[in-house]
A protein has these predicted regions:
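Alpha-helical subdomain
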Residues: 2-158
Length: 158
């Protein structure tokens, strides 16, 4: 039996179970622009169509002025690899992936309220690689980061 840490809310952390395309979940957040807000979404947007992601990001940028959204993404070429290796490899035949980011700067064009769009390396950008991963694995990690096959994107709203 596996034991998982419970997701608990605190004064600074709040979890919402919802349909992201129904933006009524915005109303569940006691948001004050002077306090700021950061949204983290890991492994989420791959499964959304680009038009749905654009609508969501635009609505978030307008509603959460002064906030930030941090999420992971891949290039279009990376989606094909993801579909082939991850999803089909685990026999997830009914699942598809759609959303990718080839040029992070195009995200700013979606809304005048997106003031900054920055791409950071996914595997090497926040923690240095070390010997425990092995030589070949470190080379693969560096390639994935340099090619933007894996990236962490930060959007700032104003």
């Amino acid at each position: 039996m596996k034991t998982f840490l419970p997701l608990t809310s605190s004064d600074m952390t709040f979890y919402i179970a919802c349909d992201l395309n129904d933006i009524s979940w915005f109303d569940q957040i006691d948001f004050h622009p002077e306090d700021g807000i950061v949204f983290f979404a890991s492994g989420v947007f791959y499964y959304f169509k680009k038009t749905d992601v654009e609508k969501l990001f635009t609505a978030m940028a307008e509603h959460f002025t002064g906030g930030k959204l941090v999420f992971d993404a891949t290039k279009k070429k990376g989606l094909k690899s993801m579909l082939k290796t991850w999803l089909k490899g685990f026999e997830m035949k009914d699942i598809n992936v759609y959303f990718s980011v080839d040029d992070v700067h195009t995200l700013k064009e979606w809304s005048g309220h997106i003031s900054s769009a920055v791409s950071n390396p996914y595997l090497t950008g926040y923690r240095p690689l070390d010997k425990r991963y092995g030589f070949i694995t470190n080379i693969v990690f560096r390639y994935l980061d340099r090619s933007k096959m894996c990236q962490i994107i930060e959007l700032e709203f104003d």
